Curated annotation (Swiss-Prot):
Bilayer-spanning residue ranges: none
Pfam family, one: Tlp
UniProt-listed InterPro entries: SASP_thioredoxin-like (IPR017524)
Lineage, opening ranks: Bacteria, Bacillati, Bacillota, Bacilli, Bacillales
Induction comment from the UniProt entry of this chain: Expressed only in the forespore compartment of sporulating cells.
Keywords of the record: Sporulation
Name of the featured protein: Small, acid-soluble spore protein Tlp
GO biological process: asexual sporulation; sporulation resulting in formation of a cellular spore
Sequence ranges of Basic and acidic residues compositional bias: 27-49, 67-76
Region (Disordered): 27-76
Family note: Belongs to the Tlp family.
The UniProt record lists the keyword Lipoprotein: no
Cell compartments where the protein resides: Spore core
Species this protein is from: Halalkalibacterium halodurans (strain ATCC BAA-125 / DSM 18197 / FERM 7344 / JCM 9153 / C-125) (Bacillus halodurans)
């Protein structure tokens, strides 16, 4: 039998993912500012941060969806 869709902690889990991603971005920005990197390493780090930014946007959107679903579930 399939597991039921348990969405109880999705918002909290997503918020933790946002915090973790922001921390990684900050660490990467610190490295870019203070460490000597060759052009390839710098480009890879900048590209990673661009992907992280896209992930943050997706997380924020998903948080809104989950909060809306939670409100709708409470109204039922």
């Amino acid at each position: 039998m399939a597991n039921p869709d348990n969405r109880n902690n999705n918002v909290e889990r997503l918020k933790q993912m946002v915090r973790n991603t922001k921390a990684k971005m900050e660490a990467a920005n610190e490295a870019l500012a203070h460490e000597e990197m060759n052009a390839e390493e710098r480009q890879r780090t900048e590209e990673k941060n661009n992907r992280r930014k896209q992930s943050l946007d997706a997380f924020e959107s998903e948080i809104l969806d989950e909060q809306s679903a939670r409100i709708n579930d409470d109204e039922v």
